[in-house]
Swiss-Prot record:
Annotated protein name in UniProt: DNA mismatch repair protein MutS
SMART domains reported for this sequence: MUTSac, MUTSd
PANTHER family for this protein: DNA MISMATCH REPAIR PROTEIN MSH1, MITOCHONDRIAL, DNA MISMATCH REPAIR PROTEIN MUTS FAMILY MEMBER
Binding locations of ATP: G812, P813, N814, M815, S816, G817, K818, S819
Keywords: ATP-binding, DNA damage, DNA repair, DNA-binding, Nucleotide-binding
GO terms under biological process: mismatch repair
Lineage of producing organism: Bacteria, Bacillati, Chloroflexota, Chloroflexia, Chloroflexales
C-alpha cells in the first residue's frame, strides 16, 4: 500500500471497530483482503488456510467445513474479547478445495508466509502446492509478526495446477474488446502455453466472435469494465431492450416476418454474473493500445510484432495485451510459458455458429458429457495433449485442400499398417501429458513440482521406442503447432511487473539466463572446501550465485572454457523447424542423473536422513550423486547421529556410571542424564543443563556441536533441495523449445493414430475432397447413432450439387429418421474436413466453408424470446451469412406458428435459397408440410425425398430408408402410441382421423405456385392470385387429410356462427336447418 492508502485503510478500521484494539494478525489479514476484495482470501496459519468474516461463512457453506470463531480484538481498558467467524482448510488438501471454489465461480487469493520464525526453522512439514517455491526470509529486529503476502490469485481462466483442470480439455482465458464495429479476441491456455488472437470486422463481426467463443468454451472471458459488446450472454448488467432485433442486421430483419418483435423485458441487475461468473470486467486502462503493444514486446522479447502478424490488428493486440497483464497480476509475477502468439483469420477454418456446434453435438451430447457426441466416438487418443488437439480439430475443420489431403494420407498410413498403429498407440500410453508438464516446469519452482520432473523423465523414456516404431514416417508439414516453440529471452520471462503512476505497466528488465556450468562447478568446489572445514551448516557465502542466475549476460553464449557436459546441450537452445521426432536423449540422461526414482509430491517432503532405515523406502527429489552438498549434509548428519547413538555406552564405560543415559526432548535437545547418587563421579567437562529431583542433566561442547548438525540438517537439506531443483528447472527451461515441439508432435501423431483407430473400428472410408460443390455419399451412416443402436444401422445415399440437385426436400413420418439423415450428412462433411475418414461406403465432398443448422428450438426465457422467435432469428442469420459453398441443414422450419404462417415461411425460405444468386448452396430441408413437395415442379434444382415406412399386420414399420419422391402419410397416431399415450386417447384420435379423411373432398386445388429463377414478376402475380383463391375455398392435403384451418368463411358458415341455439324453439330450428340446406345446395358454402 502507498502511505495514502495505508492512512485510508487505518481510518476505515477505526470507523469499523471503534474502541477496539485489533490483533496484529487481523490487521494483516484485513490489509491483504482490502487489496483483493473480490476474492476469497485463504490466509495461511499453521496447518490450515483460514478464512474469516464473510469469507468464512461462504466457505463453510460451500465446502461443508466447520464454522468456528477466533479472537481478533479486545476492548480497550476491559477484559472483553471480540471474535470473528473462521473456517479453515487443511494445507495438504487445499488443491481440491480451491478447485471447488473456483468451479463455483469464485476468485481465490492465496496468502502465504514469506518470513520465518526461529521455531518455523525447525518445522520440516512440506509446504502446500502454492507455496513450494517461496524463498522465506528470517524475521529481523523487533518485528515478531510473520509477514505474509498474496502469492497467487486463482481464477477460472488462470488455473495451471494439473489436478484442478480436466486433462482432455483446454482451460482457456479469453479477452474480448469491441470498437467501431470491429472486435478483437485473444485467448490463452496458461497450462499449455497456447496463445492466439484474431480480429473480426464487418456486419458479421458479432456473429463470428460469438461462434469463436462457443468453440473455445473459455473458462473465463475478460472484457473492458465499461464494455457494451452486444453479444448474447456478455451484457455487463441488464438485458438490452429488444435485444434480438438490435443484434440483427438490416438484411436479417427483412427476412423476418413483419411485425415480429421481442418482448420488452429488462433483467434485474446481475452483478454476481460479473463477480463470480465466467465474465470478468477488467479496468479499461489495461486495454490501452500502447500499453498492450509494449506489454507484448516485453513478454516475447522482441522489438516488433510484425513477425506475429499482429501489426495491423490493433484490437487483437489490445485483447492479447490484456491477457498477459491479467495473467501476470493473478500469477503475482511473470508468465514464462507465453512465449509467442499465433494470429489467425476467420476464414482459416470452416465457420460453425453456436447453434450448429450444439445441434450437431460435436463436443457434448444431450447429457452434457462426451457421451453421445462426435468427439466421444472419434477420441481414441492415448495422451491428454492428443485429446485436446483432437477437440480443436473437431471444432475447427479446415478449408485448405492441400492440408486435408495430407491429413488423410497420414490417417491412411495408420489405417493400412495395423502393426504401426498398435505399437505407436501402446507406446503413447506411457507419454502422459508432456505438454502441460513442460509448461509447468518452464514457469519455475513456484509452479513445478518434483512429480512434474518425474513425469517428464518417464515420458522421455518412452520416446526411443516411439521413434523406432515410426521409422522414417513424420507428420505432415504445417500440422505441428509451433506457437511458443521458440526460446524466450530470459529477460522477458523474468521481468518484474510494476505500475506507473497512471496505472500502466512498467517492466524493468532483470538480466538472467540459463544455468552456468562454470558457476555450478565453482559452487561445488566451494562446497567441498567447506566440508573439509566442517562448515556445512553455516551461512551462505556472499559470492555464491543466486538460484536461477549465471555468469552469462542475456544473449551471450557460455565461454569456451566451459567444459562439455550433458547440460550444455540445453543452454540457449533454439528451436528449429524439423519434422523428425526429437527423442531429447540428452535431456533424458540429465533427468536420470538429477531426479530420484520416486520423488515426493512436494519440495521439502524428502526423507534423505531416514531412507533405508527400518525398511523405509527412499523418497527423495534429488538423486544421490547429483548435488554433492546434499550428499555431504546427509553424510554429516548420519555421522552425527551415529556418534550420538554411540555416546551412551562410551560414557558409561569411561565414567563408570552404569545408569548414565543419553536422551532427547524438544525443549532441551540432547542431554546426558546422571542420577544424584553418582553426582561425585560426573566429569569436569560436563556442563549442567537442568536439575531434576532424581538427578542432573548435562551436555558437552562436543555433544552440542553434533546436536546442531542433526537439528540443522533437515532444514539445510530443504534449502539445498529447493536450490538444486531451481537449477534443474532452469536447465529444462533452456530446452523448453525442443521439449514443447516434441510434445506437440507427439500430440499430432496421437490424433492421427486415434482417427485411424476410429476408422478401423467404425469401418470408415477415406473421403475424396474436391474444390467444387458436389456432395455424394454412398451408404452414409450417422457415426454416433450407429454405435448406440442394438440393431443394424440402415445406411443411406445422397447426391447433391449446386447445378442440378441443390435442395433435397425430405418428408416422412415422425421417428422415421429424417433428423438422423440431416445430421449424418453434416457430420460426414465435417469429419472429412478435420482429416478423418467417414462412415460411408464412398464419399465425394466439395469443400464446405460453413455449416448452418436449424434443428429444434426452445423458449429463451432469459431474453424474452419465444420458440418461434428463436427459430426465426437463427433462420435469418443463416440466410444472411451463407455462401455458395455452405451446407444448410433445416429441420421443420415454421412449425412454431400457425399452419399457414409456418408453411408460407417454409416455402419462402426454400425459394430464397434456390433463387438468391448469392446463395444457391447445398441444402437439406426436412418438413411435415407435404404440400411443399409440389415445389419440385417449379424449382428445377429441388428434389423430393422421403423416409420410407410400411404397414404390416396393422402396425407401422419404419424402414429408415431415404427414397426419391414425397411422403403420403405422417403416422402421427402410431408415434403417439409408441410414446405411451393412453389407449382411450389413441382410439379417439383414430376415430377423428377416419372421420376427417371421410369428409375430405376427393380433389384438391394446386399449392401456391413457387417463384422460379426466370419468373420473378410472374411469381408475384401468381402468388397474389393464389392468396385470393385460398380465401375462397378450403384445401385438401395431398395425402387426403382435411386441413382444419383452411375453411374460408361463407354464407353457411356465417349463418351457423350467428345462430343462438339456446334461444331456438324446435320449429325455428327446423326452419333454420331448411335454410342452411338450400344455401348449401345453391353452392353458398
Amino acid at each position: 500500500m502507498t502511505p495514502a492508502e495505508r492512512r485510508a485503510f487505518e481510518r476505515q478500521l477505526q470507523q469499523e471497530f471503534p474502541g477496539l484494539e485489533l490483533h496484529a494478525w487481523y490487521r494483516q489479514y484485513r490489509s491483504l483482503k482490502a487489496a483483493h476484495p473480490d476474492a476469497i482470501l485463504l490466509y495461511r496459519l499453521g496447518d490450515f488456510y483460514e478464512t474469516f468474516d464473510d469469507d468464512a461463512k461462504l466457505v463453510a457453506d460451500l465446502l461443508e467445513v466447520t464454522l468456528t470463531y477466533k479472537e481478533f480484538a479486545s476492548q480497550k481498558g476491559r477484559d472483553q474479547k471480540q471474535r470473528c467467524p473462521m473456517a479453515g482448510i487443511p494445507y495438504h488438501a487445499v488443491e481440491g478445495y480451491v478447485a471447488r471454489l473456483v468451479g463455483a465461480g469464485y476468485r481465490v487469493a492465496i496468502a502465504e508466509q514469506i518470513t520465518e520464525t526461529p521455531s518455523s526453522r525447525t518445522d520440516t512439514r512440506p509446504r502446500s502446492i502454492f507455496a513450494a517455491g517461496i524463498e522465506q526470509t528470517s524475521l529481523t529486529g523487533s518485528n515478531r509478526m510473520v509477514e505474509r503476502k498474496v502469492v497467487r490469485v486463482i481464477t477460472p481462466g488462470t488455473i495451471i495446477e494439473s489436478g484442478m483442470i480436466p486433462a482432455e480439455r483446454n482451460n482457456y482465458l479469453a479477452a474480448l474488446i469491441a470498437d467501431h464495429g470491429r472486435i478483437g479476441l485473444a485467448y490463452a491456455d496458461l497450462s499449455t502455453g497456447e496463445f492466439a488472437a484474431v480480429e473480426f470486422s464487418g456486419e458479421r463481426a458479432a456473429q463470428q466472435a460469438q461462434g469463436e467463443l462457443t468453440r473455445l468454451n473459455a473458462a473465463e472471458i475478460l472484457v473492458p469494465d465499461r464494455a457494451d459488446l452486444r453479444l448474447p450472454g456478455l451484457e455487463p448488467s441488464s438485458a438490452r431492450l429488444e435485444q434480438d432485433l438490435e443484434f440483427l442486421t438490416r438484411e436479417e430483419r427483412e427476412l423476418l416476418l413483419p411485425g415480429e418483435r421481442v418482448a420488452r423485458r429488462v433483467e434485474r441487475e446481475n452483478n454476481a454474473r460479473w463477480a463470480h461468473g465466467r465474465v470478468t470486467a477488467w479496468p479499461e486502462r489495461r486495454w490501452d493500445l500502447r500499453n498492450a503493444h509494449d506489454t507484448l514486446l516485453h513478454q516475447f522479447g522482441v522489438r516488433s510484432l510484425a513477425g506475429f502478424g499482429l501489426e495491423d490488428r490493433p484490437l487483437a493486440i489490445r485483447a492479447a495485451g490484456a491477457i498477459v497483464q491479467y495473467a501476470r497480476e493473478t500469477q503475482q509475477g511473470v508468465v514464462a510459458n507465453l512465449r509467442s502468439i499465433r494470429a489467425y483469420t476467420p476464414g482459416d477454418a470452416m465457420f460453425l455458429d453456436p447453434q450448429t456446434q450444439r445441434n450437431l453435438e460435436l463436443l457434448e451430447g444431450a447429457s452434457g458429457t462426451t457421451r453421445g457426441s462426435l468427439i466421444g466416438v472419434l477420441d481414441q487418443t492415448r495422451t491428454p495433449m492428443g485429446a485436446r488437439l483432437l477437440r480443436r480439430w473437431v471444432s475447427q475443420p479446415l478449408c485448405d485442400l492441400t492440408r486435408l489431403h495430407a491429413r488423410h494420407d497420414a490417417v491412411e498410413r495408420f489405417v493400412t499398417d495395423a502393426i504401426l498403429r498398435a505399437s505407436v498407440r501402446e507406446t503413447l500410453r506411457r507419454v502422459g501429458d508432456m505438454e502441460r508438464v513442460v509448461n509447468r516446469i518452464i514457469q519455475g519452482v513456484g509452479v513445478a513440482t518434483p512429480r512434474d520432473m518425474a513425469r517428464l523423465r518417464d515420458a522421455l523414456r518412452a520416446l526411443p521406442e516411439l521413434v523406432a516404431a515410426l521409422g522414417d514416417w513424420t507428420p505432415p508439414p504445417g500440422e505441428i503447432d509451433l506457437t511458443g516453440v521458440r526460446t524466450l529471452p530470459p529477460s522477458a520471462a523474468t521481468d518484474p511487473v510494476s505500475l506507473t503512476e497512471n496505472g500502466n505497466e512498467r517492466i524493468e528488465p532483470n538480466q538472467t539466463s540459463a544455468v552456468s556450468l562454470r558457476a555450478q562447478r565453482e559452487a561445488r568446489r566451494r562446497v567441498s572446501a567447506r566440508y573439509a572445514d566442517e562448515d556445512l551448516f553455516g551461512e551462505e557465502e556472499q559470492n555464491a550465485p543466486p538460484v536461477g542466475s549465471s555468469n552469462h549476460a542475456v544473449g551471450t553464449q557460455p565461454s569456451a572454457d566451459d567444459e562439455a557436459s550433458p547440460v550444455t546441450a540445453f543452454v540457449d537452445d533454439q528451436a528449429t523447424e524439423t519434422l523428425a521426432l526429437d527423442p531429447c536423449a540428452d535431456m533424458l540422461a540429465f533427468l536420470e542423473t538429477a531426479i530420484d526414482d520416486e520423488p515426493p509430491a512436494l519440495l521439502g517432503a524428502s526423507n534423505y536422513l531416514r531412507a533405508g532405515e527400518n525398511g523405509e523406502p527412499p523418497r527423495r527429489v534429488i538423486r544421490p550423486g547429483f548435488e554433492p552438498e546434499i550428499d555431504q549434509v546427509v553424510a554429516a548428519s548420519r555421522d552425527a547421529q551415529r556418534w550420538i547413538s554411540e555416546l551412551e555406552p562410551k560414557e558409561r564405560e569411561r565414567t563408570g556410571i552404569k545408569s548414565l543415559r543419553v536422551d532427547y526432548n524438544r525443549v532441551f535437545g540432547y542431554y546426558i542424564e546422571v542420577p544424584k547418587t553418582y553426582a561425585d563421579q560426573v566429569p569436569k567437562h560436563y556442563i549442567r543443563k537442568q536439575t531434576l529431583t532424581t538427578g542432573e542433566r548435562y551436555f558437552t561442547d562436543e555433544l552440542k556441536r553434533y546436536e546442531e548438525i542433526v537439528e540443522q540438517a533437515q532444514q539445510r537439506l530443504i534449502d539445498l533441495e529447493r536450490r538444486a531443483f531451481a537449477r534443474i528447472c532452469d536447465v529444462v527451461t533452456g530446452a523448453g523449445a525442443r521439449l514443447l515441439r516434441t510434445a506437440r508432435m507427439i500430440a499430432t501423431i496421437d490424433v492421427f493414430a486415434a482417427l485411424a483407430e476410429a476408422a478401423v473400428r467404425g469401418r470408415y472410408v477415406r473421403p475424396e475432397l474436391y474444390d467444387d460443390t458436389r456432395l455424394r455419399i454412398v451408404g452414409g451412416r450417422h457415426p454416433v447413432v450407429e454405435q448406440t443402436l442394438d440393431e443394424t444401422f440402415v445406411p443411406n445415399d445422397i447426391e447433391m450439387d449446386t447445378e442440378t440437385r441443390q435442395i433435397c426436400l425430405i418428408t416422412g413420418p415422425n421417428m422415421s429418421g429424417k433428423s438422423t439423415v440431416l445430421r449424418q450428412v453434416a457430420l460426414i462433411a465435417l469429419m472429412a474436413q478435420i482429416g478423418s475418414f467417414v462412415p460411408a461406403d464412398a464419399a465425394e465432398i466439395g469443400l464446405v466453408d460453413r455449416i448452418f443448422t436449424r434443428i429444434g428450438a426452445q423458449d429463451d426465457i432469459a431474453t424474452g424470446r419465444s420458440t418461434f422467435m428463436v427459430e426465426m432469428t437463427e433462420t435469418a442469420a443463416l440466410l444472411a451469412q451463407s455462401t455458395r459453398r455452405s451446407l444448410i441443414i433445416l429441420d421443420e422450419v415454421g412449425r412454431g406458428t400457425s399452419t399457414y404462417d409456418g408453411m408460407a415461411i417454409a416455402q419462402a425460405v426454400i425459394e430464397y435459397i434456390h433463387n438468391e444468386p448469392r446463395l444457391g448452396c447445398r441444402t437439406l430441408f426436412a418438413t411435415h408440410y407435404h404440400e411443399l413437395t409440389d415445389l419440385e415442379r417449379t424449382l428445377p434444382r429441388l428434389k423430393n425425398y422421403h423416409m420410407a415406412a410400411t404397414e404390416q399386420d396393422g402396425r407401422v414399420v419404419f424402414l429408415h430408408e431415404l427414397r426419391p419422391g414425397g411422403a403420403d402419410r405422417s403416422y402421427g397416431i402410431h408415434v403417439a402410441e409408441l410414446a405411451g399415450i393412453p389407449q382411450s386417447v389413441i382410439r379417439r384420435a383414430s376415430e377423428l382421423l377416419a372421420e376427417l379423411e371421410r369428409r375430405a373432398p376427393r380433389s384438391a386445388p394446386p399449392t401456391v405456385p413457387a417463384r422460379g429463377d426466370d419468373r420473378r414478376s410472374a411469381g408475384r402475380a401468381s402468388s397474389s392470385g393464389a392468396g385470393a383463391a385460398r380465401g375462397e375455398q378450403g384445401r385438401t392435403l395431398p395425402d387426403g387429410q382435411l386441413s382444419l384451418f383452411d375453411l374460408a368463411p361463407g354464407p353457411v358458415i356465417e349463418m351457423l356462427r350467428r345462430i343462438d341455439i339456446n334461444q331456438l324453439t324446435p320449429l325455428e330450428a327446423l326452419n333454420k336447418l331448411h335454410e342452411l340446406q338450400k344455401l348449401a345446395r345453391a353452392g353458398g358454402g
